[in-house]
């Protein structure tokens, strides 16, 4: 509860009593001044002040002045300690009022706390003479008219501010001296005023306690007057002291406030205590964790030491055994006879005499080896092992039983190793005699000045060129072939059968300026570029499970980006896992591009305008983003730091020759850095058949690519045929003349022997039935011809047997074995069944095989001819038998043709079966509007779909026919069908039925669509793709209702 407010009376100030009180206050003020002057003059006379009779307390201005002077003296001198506190005077109240305590309880508490603090400081400071503190006087109330009067407070705001300023000045210089006692303010003898003052003092006391360094309250009257000069004031009489004693009163409100502060402090202490305990617990946990970690680390260290010890011992023994076995194996290969492990060899006494003839290289090597002393493999003594184990026992980590067990295991392992070593030595001794002659012959170097290191060690890599139609593949090949042709000379570039061979000398001349900058070292003899169509040269040809091409060049038109066949080529490259680079062709088509004929691209890029360079950068970024969409990382070749993870982009122009040298150099670099071991030359034959052609003057020939090995004239070969393996002998090995004469068919160069890699035309009898895309085998003198024939047959059968034929499907014809395999994968992807497959041109018999589908499934009576020739007899047979033949040279175009073909067949079939097929539905009759001619009813579709033309019957009424639906209305609108849960009005034609509603059937039973076996078959053939799972389930249920088999 707040303090009670004093009721203000306006008539007091208008009356004459206010003037009288003002005059009396002025008189008292003058008396106070005179008295203060007299006090200052008389030092030994005590101050005696009369009690004012007026009901107003005088305003003592001298107190503030004396207070200011005393504060100034306190700054200079040590503060003197105050004496005992005088009691406060209580003013008598009216007859009906009880006496009011002048000082508030908060002021008493403050004065008591101040007195306690001052007593503590007395022990530190020297005490001075105390000065008596005057108490404030209480003005008596007016008894004349028995009314409450307003009171003028004795202390002014000016004195308080002055005292605060003096105290702040004192704090800056020295420690503040605490006053002995605080004088109480004079208050009127009114209950409301007393309560108000007490509440104010409570707020002041609470605010002062919350501060970190509480400031002491200001003094209202003269606390100290010239402490050094003025003697202490005289004590008042006993009567006055008795009168000044305050009436006892229990301060209830301050005690409640003190209890609240106490609880708040206790709560803060509890929180702080809990935080401290939590911190201590966390530190203990961290300490325990650290100790546990130290223990675990020590255990791990001991264990690692033990393991490292074991590994070191094991490695040392294995290394010793391996070194000994290797040394003995080398000696055995050199022809040294080793009797047994551990036996000493006798030193050879054979020495060359000075001046004698030198022995051959083999005998000298054998003699030098025999002079060597073969050391016996000695094992470590057991005493050393025991000593090592004893040293580990000092760690107190292993028990005696464990050490003993390890010793036994070690001894057992040594015995096993020694036994294995003896067996290996015996085996090496057996092989030594057989290998001695060959090893000795191998040590004799054979030098041939006509062969180079590159020709001897490596073959030419086979490069395939892929890309979309009209991206410049053929132009790029022509530019590569004709780059160094000057003055009508080919400069070593020869045109091979189905391939273009670029020798290393031509590549060096073409990339001369570029290769010198990077100090290129050419190790390959050249490049073999396959110029057959991409899908033939790459996807189809198989050579012992790997693709024909070592590296592919994917040509992309920089103006158009990735196109349909480009994506197909990327998929083929991924399927074969063949590395490739990208040639960004037609850079000369960029706007404002300045052509630089036969220049490396980086030099041509430097002279371009800013707009042309920016457009080139934009095009490159678009292609990189498109390749990223195909999950390929790509970058321009001079910025590519990792060729294994990023595809190199080489800008080129087949028209001006820009970037051609860059392309050749990037191919060489990629092959030499990453795939040099793949193009290493071996004597094992690897040859793939490309095409079967009839050449005038030679008959039937085959074009092959010799990947590895050597072919000789007269070799016996085996190739795969349509009717089985073909055995024949090579009559001629032909290559075309230089490039300028390549178009003359009658001129070929005949070779006795050709080494890989090369494109060759082989002339041999009986090659008419050879299968392109298969391997060519050479039969050696010690080879099993039956095994080779089985392998050739298995190569064709593996593809033909992989065809998943269900007896119903299309017929497929392809040019090569590989193209057939690729085409079958494509048809499987688009879910087209295959019934028959064949390789080679389309004949009449193939049309007859396809016509079988006319009886089984007419929509599959088609033949797909992929890149093959169609004979005239086959075309006539197809027209007569109504078999459609679809032919094309690219795979992706077949998808559009097949969609168009099956779409036309489907529309035709639907038109034929529309009047027969019946869709399943179950109806619930809600209203009958008309009984006949026609029947008009309201129905709800419970299951299926209701369509116009659907026959309706009632199965529960002996399958009574209702009629055929001729109209459906939904929300007053005509519709062609009603779906499940639709409520519609239906018009049913009953003219052709012999039943009547409510006589043969009623509306209380379910009505259904009437299905038959013919309607089910027609629905499956023409509308199977439109049937839902719910429709199929409903048809199964209705088959049981109508008992259809």
From Swiss-Prot:
Chief place where the protein resides: cytoplasm
Annotated ranges, domain tr-type G: 458-675
SUPFAM superfamilies noted in UniProt: Initiation factor IF2/eIF5b, domain 3, P-loop containing nucleoside triphosphate hydrolases, Translation proteins
Known catalytic reactions: GTP + H2O = GDP + phosphate + H(+)
Coiled-coil annotated spans: none
Localization: Cytoplasm
Record GO biological process: regulation of translational initiation; translational initiation
Biased amino acid composition, Low complexity: 81-92, 216-241, 351-361
Residues at which GTP binds: 467-474
Region annotated G3, chain positions: 531-534
Keywords: Cytoplasm, GTP-binding, Hydrolase, Initiation factor, Metal-binding, Nucleotide-binding, Phosphoprotein, Protein biosynthesis
GO annotations of cellular component type: cytoplasm
Region of interest (G1), residue spans: 467-474
Location of region: G4: 585-588
Cofactor note: Binds 1 monovalent cation per monomer in the active site. Structural cofactor that stabilizes the GTP-bound 'on' state. May also act as a transition state stabilizer of the hydrolysis reaction.
Region listing for Disordered, in residue ranges: 1-325, 339-384
EC number from the UniProt entry: 3.6.5.3
Annotated Acidic residues bias: 62-73, 105-120, 155-169, 199-212
Region G5, residue ranges: 653-655
Molecular function GO labels: GTP binding; GTPase activity; metal ion binding; translation initiation factor activity
Region (G2): 492-496
PROSITE patterns per record: G_TR_2
Its biological purpose: Plays a role in translation initiation. Translational GTPase that catalyzes the joining of the 40S and 60S subunits to form the 80S initiation complex with the initiator methionine-tRNA in the P-site base paired to the start codon. GTP binding and hydrolysis induces conformational changes in the enzyme that renders it active for productive interactions with the ribosome. The release of the enzyme after formation of the initiation complex is a prerequisite to form elongation-competent ribosomes.
Family per record: Belongs to the TRAFAC class translation factor GTPase superfamily. Classic translation factor GTPase family. IF-2 subfamily.
Designated name of the protein: Eukaryotic translation initiation factor 5B
Name of the gene this protein is made from: eif5b
